[in-house]
Amino acid sequence: MLSYLSGTLIEKFSTEIVVEVNGVGYLLNISATTHEKLPAIGNQIKILTYLYVREDALQLYGFITTEDREVFKLLIAISGVGPKLAQTILSGMSTAQLRESVIAGDTKALTAIAGVGKKTAERIILELKDKLVKLDLKIDIKETAFRSDKQQVRNDAYSALISLGFTKSIAEKAMRAAIAEVPDGSVDDLIRVALRHVQS
């Protein structure tokens, strides 16, 4: 199962994008919310994916955030809500707005979206209310773990600079510059950039 694609954004339209990975172009369906978060054509992109399997076709859906993908999966599990309507819903409101509407039981906000009738809105609220609360906790745990891993990488890079003989003030200044330049860099990336700033 594809979890994500990392490559070059070749084309982007209102509901579709093409990402090239190792010479292969992947067509992904996206929501308007995802479209707003895309980089410019030609830039590198890491996009989360969901493969929807039908009898006559395989369709890839793309998401910038874990939350968007998880909510999409919850939506298509509801009877009467297919991937097309799920994307329409995620285009009409953010996942945060959807969560607020569902928890508040606000059918009016949901029926304001094209294709969502009163019965569908009521079904969405009934089936998602508890699941969205649990999803929040699940995502918070994942993001906390990610932040912890990132902090450990930064701590290791800082310790390496100290072991190389740099003072704390110089190491801290170099690390701030390195983090600003490569916020998601590995230990080696951070050390390399930090050393460049120290030597400049």
From Swiss-Prot:
GO terms for molecular function: ATP binding; four-way junction DNA binding; four-way junction helicase activity. InterPro entries: DNA_helicase_Holl-junc_RuvA_I, Hlx-hairpin-Hlx_DNA-bd_motif, NA-bd_OB-fold, RuvA, RuvA_2-like, RuvA_C, RuvA_C_sf. Keywords: Cytoplasm, DNA damage, DNA recombination, DNA repair, DNA-binding. Gene3D superfamilies: 5' to 3' exonuclease, C-terminal subdomain (1.10.150.20), DNA helicase RuvA subunit, C-terminal domain (1.10.8.10), Nucleic acid-binding proteins (2.40.50.140). Residues 144-148 are annotated as: Flexible linker. Its main location: cytoplasm. GO terms for biological process: DNA recombination; DNA repair. Residues 65-143 are annotated as: Domain II. The keyword Cytoplasm applies. Residues 149-200 are annotated as: Domain III. Residues 1-64 are annotated as: Domain I. It is found in: Cytoplasm. The RuvA-RuvB-RuvC complex processes Holliday junction (HJ) DNA during genetic recombination and DNA repair, while the RuvA-RuvB complex plays an important role in the rescue of blocked DNA replication forks via replication fork reversal (RFR). RuvA specifically binds to HJ cruciform DNA, conferring on it an open structure. The RuvB hexamer acts as an ATP-dependent pump, pulling dsDNA into and through the RuvAB complex. HJ branch migration allows RuvC to scan DNA until it finds its consensus sequence, where it cleaves and resolves the cruciform DNA. Has three domains with a flexible linker between the domains II and III and assumes an 'L' shape. Domain III is highly mobile and contacts RuvB. Homotetramer. Forms an RuvA(8)-RuvB(12)-Holliday junction (HJ) complex. HJ DNA is sandwiched between 2 RuvA tetramers; dsDNA enters through RuvA and exits via RuvB. An RuvB hexamer assembles on each DNA strand where it exits the tetramer. Each RuvB hexamer is contacted by two RuvA subunits (via domain III) on 2 adjacent RuvB subunits; this complex drives branch migration. In the full resolvosome a probable DNA-RuvA(4)-RuvB(12)-RuvC(2) complex forms which resolves the HJ. Belongs to the RuvA family. This is Holliday junction branch migration complex subunit RuvA. It comes from Chloroherpeton thalassium (strain ATCC 35110 / GB-78).
